[in-house]
């Protein structure tokens, strides 16, 4: 509701959930958990974005569900992974994918504050990564007969999306210092405002070949 406000259609739900059957369950109640367990027993894939404490509370750990269905593909998408000091933090597109992976910092002009990003970009990119893991697990199941657990996180996919700059930092290349020393970005890769107040995005990294 925060995203679509008073609009008569929940267009976010329509984008990601069209043509899907749905059911609402209260997992805080034993009856709700029982229904979900019945569904899991005959499912191919179970996808969730719960933290470890929630999985324990709702009786949805990998070992528990695998005991009900040995062929189940258990897929999880978290904010900051399942191990490490941030694993129990709530993760959102803005905080984990955009901010923690350094993408927000790269997009801000000069020393100004980062702009608040649009929502859903990192969510969708990370979902495709999880989809790839699920498909590989299904392929493996055809050979082994057994399910498996696959996982990814928003921060991991943000790091991959920002991989060129992070790899540069690991190698000792400081893009910010280079831009500060030059005082400008490349004129061949820049956004220019036109006389009629529109904008042209120019990307010509190799002028000799253009």
Where are each of the predicted segments found?
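N-terminal helix-loop segment corresponding to the beta1-alpha1 unit
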Residues: 1-146, 178
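Residue-level detector of beta-strand structural context in well-folded domains
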Residues: 12-14, 150, 190
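Hydrophobic residues in beta-strands and at strand termini
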Residues: 25-27, 154, 194
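Active-site-adjacent beta-strand anchor residues
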Residues: 26, 48, 152, 201-205
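Glycine-rich beta-alpha junction loops
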Residues: 79-81, 154-160, 196-198, 204-209
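Short beta-strand->loop
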Residues: 118-125, 152-154, 202-203
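Substrate-binding/catalytic subdomain of NAD(P)-dependent oxidoreductase enzymes
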Residues: 138-178
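Alpha-helical interface/anchor segments and their boundary "cap" residues
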Residues: 172-210
